[in-house]
Amino acid sequence: MNTSFGSVVPSTNFNFFKGHGNNDNTSANSTVNNSNFFLNSNETKPSKNVFMVHSTSQKKSQQPLQNLSHSPSYTENKPDKKKKYMINDAKTIQLVGPLISSPDNLGFQKRSHKARELPRFLINQEPQLEKRAFVQDPWDKANQEKMISLEESIDDLNELYETLKKMRNTERSIMEEKGLVDKADSAKDLYDAIVFQGTCLDMCPTFERSRRNVEYTVYSYEKNQPNDKKASRTKALKVFARPAAAAAPPLPSDVRPPHILVKTLDYIVDNLLTTLPESEGFLWDRMRSIRQDFTYQNYSGPEAVDCNERIVRIHLLILHIMVKSNVEFSLQQELEQLHKSLITLSEIYDDVRSSGGTCPNEAEFRAYALLSKIRDPQYDENIQRLPKHIFQDKLVQMALCFRRVISNSAYTERGFVKTENCLNFYARFFQLMQSPSLPLLMGFFLQMHLTDIRFYALRALSHTLNKKHKPIPFIYLENMLLFNNRQEIIEFCNYYSIEIINGDAADLKTLQHYSHKLSETQPLKKTYLTCLERRLQKTTYKGLINGGEDNLASSVYVKDPKKDRIPSIADQSFLMENFQNNYNEKLNQNSSVKPQINTSPKRVATRPNHFPFSQESKQLPQISQSHTLSTNPLLTPQVHGDLSEQKQQQIKTVTDGGSPFVFDQSAQNSTVEASKAHMISTTSNGAYDEKLSSEQEEMRKKEEQRIEEEKTQLKKKQENADKQVITEQIANDLVKEVVNSSVISIVKREFSEANYRKDFIDTMTRELYDAFLHERLYLIYMDSRAELKRNSTLKKKFFEKWQASYSQAKKNRILEEKKREEIKLVSHQLGVPGFKKSTCLFRTPYKGNVNSSFMLSSSDKNLIFSPVNDEFNKFATHLTKISKLWRPLEMQSIYYDNLTKKFPSNSLTPANLFIYAKDWTSLSNRWILSKFNLQTAQDSKKFSNNIISSRIICIDDEYEPSDFSDLQLLIFNTGVTNPDIFDLEMKLKDDGEELIKLITGISLNTNICFSLLIIYWESAENTLSESTIKHLLKLNRISKNYSSVIERIDLMNLTEESPHKCLEDKLSEISHSYVYKLTERGKYDKTLRQKRSLAGIHSRSTQLQTTKDIDQKMKKMLEKEKNKYQQQIGERNTYAHLESHIDASPRSKKRKLPILLSTSHSSQFKTPLASRLNTSGSSTSPPLPSHLAMKFRKNSRVTSLHTVLPVSTPSHSNNIPAASFSGNNTTDIQSQQLIENQKSTSVYLNNVSERILGNQEICQTPINPVTPVLDGADQGKEDIPDSILELKILIDSVKKKVNND
């Protein structure tokens, strides 16, 4: 090919002249050229590479125009017809423009170049956009009918599958031979690619149905009946099959044609959408299979557009339905297929527009595409390249509005690009979501962003709140952020760790997260809007999916490019290929005929590859061969050698003109005949020379005649062209004159308006300056006054705060001094510190700080002495705020009225109520005092009527067991009762031991069975179960061992919000369920009172000594013995000076004592009497053996006490009733009357001994005292018998055993 110097266009992949596929000049893309203006005309889109030759499906073997070689071996080395070549012709050079206008004048010569093959990476497979006619191969049709008949006739599923499997191998080989499918194991050039078309007329291929029947992968939706084993032919849908690496390509019988795919999707919409949400996975797979079949056939026609659009709508509907339901599904997979469908639609829309067609629903799905990547700024740039009618569409503008409203500069996510137009108008977003004009499917798509929009909305609100701001009510969040209910708000707040106040408000200041995605945490479940759900209920799924305009019925889809535009270079090349092929075929018919090469320097100056033709001509390939030869000087025969230069110039003028040149049929035939005659004359024999010369002469004359006619036509055309030039010149002059006058008037008017505007602006400037200056001075004056006022107010407030701080500091200093003195006093008394162990290591004591372990210095007063936070109950703050909690109880109506009914009405019975607490100064104990209408712990309340008399008494560790004779109810406070508790379990264990000690004293003195109410103050941090509390307090042991004196045990856990109500209910329950019973001591006292009443003892003026005196004597005796015993141990113990430290330790009861201090093995095999006598140095004679230490025999004689002793002859009775005890329980038979009243009564040894002591004291008289056993050294003012001492030691051993258990 001959080209001019510097005019060859480089064949690169850089599309310098490639524009955007847009046919409209819109305001949105006015600066962007629609197509390559160099190589395209009439605003049509070029190929994907401007230098690529277009290929058509009608003819595969096409060869572009190229220069024929001078060598006769050209026919052997000619280029392959199936390949594509780069175009560097004169037309392209003329459009681009050469570097030099006429290189020949400068001595340059044209060089011939071989056509370069088009690179493979520039070859594109054009999709089919027009509707395709369905054509099925007869053999394939017969084969599918045979497969269907076999499916109906064979019932065995395995046999059917094997039969069809064998037929499939034959089918593949025949399809490969027919060229309907590519071979499985052979590589194939892209030039030889086939146009694949599916031929399956069912919604699921026959072979796949058979295979799935064997594999048991048929869904219930694909069967006629749920119990069927075979898939129904009318209901089965083809599954998606992921292509394997080495798998064979699908057969035509496995792929459904476009009209069957439309039918399949219609079936899904009409019959399966109502089965959602259970069928979500099934529909997801079947819709993906539909899109896969379109891809197999490389089909982008109307059916593909319709199916992909409806698939997008179905995915949007599924997103809403699945979020609304509780069925688990993969949101990521649904969004992935939705995005892929939108990308496929965008590519089809671009291809259709480049071909001159339109799609009626493009704007709707362009809007969905904008929402698919709602924070990607690249989509904003792409949408501006679309035509105006799409960019200005209502749906596209609405999608752009949502993109702007949702944009948020605080959004943090990997790959997110922050832009300058981030609005975060979350309130406007939720207003638009409630608008009825919002399309329903678009609303479903936007619902996917509800969680992050709500999160960043609350985060923005949290930045606007100060520390004193109240929590945001739930009703405000529900209305502003469209939460469906309060439960949804609570779940949202709990997920993002937002504190909820009183169950109806959220403290946004506690929001600490910066992103809506929490690391290592499952995402929050997607939610939906009820306003959209209500709109969905008013429509049907089918109507929602099939909405929009029908693509299949659209009259305008793809326009014919041949009718609407002038053919481009690629089309011209295609025409030249057809002509060149025809010429080569005719040239090869006679290999001996060779054209004569003209070596004359005079050549026709026509441009190669320029073939003017009529736009309306439909027979484009039929171009004159003579004209084709004249365009190429290498192929021009001698017959044109005598044309004058003027004729050449005229031909060049015609060639360069804009009007088409039309060849008539006669000229074309004559030229062809002349060419044939000339070629024959070069090879024929001499006999024909004369005949041929005459024919040539005639042809020459005809040619000259034709040229004369052409000259006439050219002359007329030249005249018309001259007229056109003159007309244009006159029109240009008129336009210039009119434009000049108009411009002058416009400029004058603009100048006057500009001057007026300038004067107006100057006047306004002066006035505004004065106004602003006055306003500024006024603001400065007001600021000065405000500053003065503020300073005075601050000084006043500062002084007040200073005075208050001084007073408080003074009080704290006084209190600190007082506490220091108390600690110092206690340290001197106990010898150990009274606070917790320090968490830091103190320095080694030196001479200056000997007492540093017992006193707090000023430098150590801020140290924390415990690694564990102190326990505090839940009501420490709650009790101080609600006044009704402190209101005293109405004990008469709540408790005493019901209790009176339980006591006998024939006498007045005392029934006292004791409240126990270690420290009555704590808040919880003060609350108890307030509820029982007591001011201090020393106060008491009385109640009496004709039946009972009661007193409410408060006790602590310092109590007298003898006061419990008339106890009816014991209230025991435990748990977090003090603010300085650091180990709750240890506290409960100590309280349990104290409770056992207290109940032991009560059991020895009470006359009636009492109720035990334990008030447990729950810890706010360490919550214990009820079973744990009972175990720590040893309630099970208490209920077992003291069942004879305890009527019932109740545990009240104050964990509710209304403790006063809980206390009222518990007291009322105890009063209703109480059963009046006498204890063994009560029964015994009652019997004695009856006996004494019969004997007249009650009439004496001098009453007998009560058991209280004995108790006091026994107590003093125990203290004396204990001190004496401790003194003796201290004399022998080297470590005695450390016992005070051991006793003061809070864990002394829980750890093992050293062997040196342990006394557990000192008297392991001694009786209590022997142990006592060994420690006493004043004893001279062994005491009598204890009658309680003897084991009770089975046939022991029971001393009868039925006969009452006369009062006049009191005597000391040595016949003490026999007592038996087993473990901790004892059984006493006092008399035959007691045996009849209660046959088997189990009581503790302490109770028995107490009654015996009481018996002995009552039966004695002052005249006849008991002879002491001890010697005179132990006889003082308090004469205590040895039997009593022995009994007390035995009681102590039993108590110790009970406590150890």
Swiss-Prot record:
Location(s), subcellular: Nucleus envelope
Domain PCI positions: 333-524
Keyword flag DNA-binding: no
Region span, Required for targeting SAC3 to the nuclear pore: 573-1301
Modified sites of kind N6-acetyllysine: 748
Domain of life assignment: Eukaryota
Protein known as: Nuclear mRNA export protein SAC3
Naturally occurring in which organism (per UniProt): Saccharomyces cerevisiae (strain ATCC 204508 / S288c) (Baker's yeast)
